[in-house]
């Protein structure tokens, strides 16, 4: 019998955190969830680490959209949950997800808590959660989940280097009922800690505004790579 849920995790050179994160997810496998990790060409030990701690470990071209689509293609679950490697799904959040899957909605996302050093990360998370609730557009940090049949019907994630999560949310919100799981995922605040809180927030807002203004994803990706390299 096929599982109710498949979790798909795209990774690229995540060896320093991957073992701990996958070990923390073993409880879902004990509860019948299929766990798929898709490696985008890591040069560290990510693939081997994932192989020992997942049901399927796949290889794909680098890029979250490509990797997540590849994972979904091999998934056997009725539902899909796309989870970033630096985001934790605790048991309470998992139980809340199962409750959501038994409802009338066809897709949704979680509220998020950002774990980091800066006190304003609480405000950042609150703003992310409020924005998603208002616009019904969620980001990958918020753990997008949906029926596999719905994911296939809209063609999966658009093949974009950035904003693939936003684009998929926009496609789904117009055709299916959504659900917000209020028990939060916990995501790593390392990008805010390393890049500086204000600079990182301004960069993310700038990217989102440019996307909404019609700037193409390839140009956005070039800009993102440029500012990350500073």
Spans of features found by a protein language model:
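Acidic helix N-cap motif at the loop->helix transition within catalytic regions
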Residues: 16-20, 44-52, 92
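Short aromatic/hydrophobic "clamp" motif used to bind/position activated sugar donors
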Residues: 80
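Short beta-strand/loop segment that forms part of the nucleotide-sugar
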Residues: 23-26, 32-41, 58
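Short, well-formed alpha-helical segments that are part of the catalytic scaffolds
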Residues: 13-27
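Conserved donor NDP-sugar-binding/catalytic core segment of glycosyltransferases
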Residues: 91-120
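Hydrophobic helical membrane-anchoring modules
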Residues: 1, 170-230
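Conserved donor nucleotide-binding strand/loop of the catalytic core
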Residues: 33-36, 47-76
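A conserved acidic beta->alpha catalytic loop
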Residues: 39-47, 87
């Amino acid at each position: 019998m096929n599982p109710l849920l498949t979790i798909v995790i795209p990774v690229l050179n995540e060896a320093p955190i991957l073992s701990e994160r996958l070990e923390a997810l073993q409880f879902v496998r004990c509860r019948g969830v299929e766990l798929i990790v898709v490696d985008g060409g890591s040069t560290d030990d990510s693939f081997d680490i994932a192989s020992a701690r997942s049901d399927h470990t796949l290889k794909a071209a680098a890029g979250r959209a490509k990797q997540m689509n590849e994972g979904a293609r091999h998934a056997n679950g009725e539902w899909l949950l796309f989870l970033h490697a630096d985001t934790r799904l605790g048991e309470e959040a998992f139980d809340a997800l199962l409750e959501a899957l038994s409802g009338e909605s066809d897709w949704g996302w979680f509220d998020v808590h950002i774990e980091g050093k800066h006190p304003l990360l609480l405000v950042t998370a609150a703003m992310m959660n409020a924005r998603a609730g208002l616009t019904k557009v969620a980001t990958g940090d918020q753990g997008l989940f949906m029926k596999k049949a719905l994911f296939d019907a809209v063609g999966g994630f658009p093949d974009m280097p950035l904003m693939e999560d936003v684009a998929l949310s926009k496609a789904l919100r117009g055709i299916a009922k959504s659900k917000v799981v209020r028990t939060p995922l916990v995501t790593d605040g390392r990008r805010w800690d390393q890049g500086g809180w204000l600079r990182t927030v301004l960069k993310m807002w700038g990217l989102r505004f440019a996307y909404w203004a019609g700037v193409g994803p390839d140009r956005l990706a070039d800009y993102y790579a440029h500012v990350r390299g500073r």
